[in-house]
């Protein structure tokens, strides 16, 4: 087992969440900015390919094991869109407000509001790792026209959880981290790592 890895992201929230869990295994997680690793392009049409590209990129430039994720919202009535384009659905520069407005606009008159958040995590032990560790999670919900809640980010105010009766933005942060698509993927990845330790 390695004692440190690079997170192929500069997101402070992800660093904190991943850092706490990997600390249980004696692994220090460092953001790619610590190594001056530039953002990796995401040219692919699947979450898995993008996450693998980011992990290999960070590992290649640092010489360390690397962890990357890719995630987004998929809407059944839109054929799975915005999917891998979730962050830039309404174009550049990225804007949660514009992305949400476009999503609601595209669903006008559509009865089927079924959607899911998807996350895949990829861990490579080295840049050319032939057998990366992969874990994913899916969180089912539905898109609502009206935003609800102040928490979260991205599509959370419009992503309603029928089982909870609230939007993701209204959910307690600790509960969200436990049951979300990212939480599910992280739990699955940690189980795989512990089995290898």
UniProtKB/Swiss-Prot annotation:
GO terms for molecular function: dITP diphosphatase activity; ITP diphosphatase activity; metal ion binding; nucleotide binding; ribonucleoside triphosphate phosphatase activity; XTP diphosphatase activity. Its EC number is 3.6.1.66. The active site is at residue 70. Its cofactor is Mg(2+). Substrate binds at residues 9-14, 71, 153-156, 176, 181-182. InterPro entries: dITP/XTP_pyrophosphatase, ITPase-like_fam, RdgB/HAM1. Binds 1 Mg(2+) ion per subunit. GO terms for biological process: nucleotide metabolic process; purine nucleoside triphosphate catabolic process. Keywords: Hydrolase, Magnesium, Metal-binding, Nucleotide metabolism, Nucleotide-binding. It is an enzyme of class 3 (hydrolase). Pfam families: Ham1p_like. Homodimer. Pyrophosphatase that catalyzes the hydrolysis of nucleoside triphosphates to their monophosphate derivatives, with a high preference for the non-canonical purine nucleotides XTP (xanthosine triphosphate), dITP (deoxyinosine triphosphate) and ITP. Seems to function as a house-cleaning enzyme that removes non-canonical purine nucleotides from the nucleotide pool, thus preventing their incorporation into DNA/RNA and avoiding chromosomal lesions. This is dITP/XTP pyrophosphatase. It comes from Chromobacterium violaceum (strain ATCC 12472 / DSM 30191 / JCM 1249 / CCUG 213 / NBRC 12614 / NCIMB 9131 / NCTC 9757 / MK).
């Amino acid at each position: 087992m390695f004692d440190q890895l690079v997170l192929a992201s500069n997101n402070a929230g992800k660093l904190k969440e991943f850092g706490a869990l990997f600390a249980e295994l004696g692994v220090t997680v460092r953001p790619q900015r610590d190594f001056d690793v530039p953002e990796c392009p995401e040219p692919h049409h699947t979450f898995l390919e993008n996450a693998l590209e980011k992990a290999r990129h960070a590992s290649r430039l640092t010489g360390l094991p690397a962890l990357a994720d890719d995630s987004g919202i998929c809407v059944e009535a839109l054929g799975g869109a915005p999917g891998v384009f979730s962050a830039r659905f309404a174009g550049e520069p990225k804007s949660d407000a514009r992305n949400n407005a476009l999503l609601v606009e595209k669903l006008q008159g559509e009865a089927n509001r079924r959607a899911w958040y998807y996350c895949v995590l990829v861990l490579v032990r080295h840049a050319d790792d032939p057998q990366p560790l992969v874990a994913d999670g899916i969180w089912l919900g539905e898109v609502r026209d009206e935003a609800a809640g102040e928490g979260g980010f991205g599509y959370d105010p419009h992503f309603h959880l029928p089982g909870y009766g609230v939007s993701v933005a209204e959910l307690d942060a600790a509960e969200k981290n436990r049951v979300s698509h990212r939480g599910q993927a992280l739990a699955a990845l940690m189980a795989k790592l512990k089995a290898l330790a």
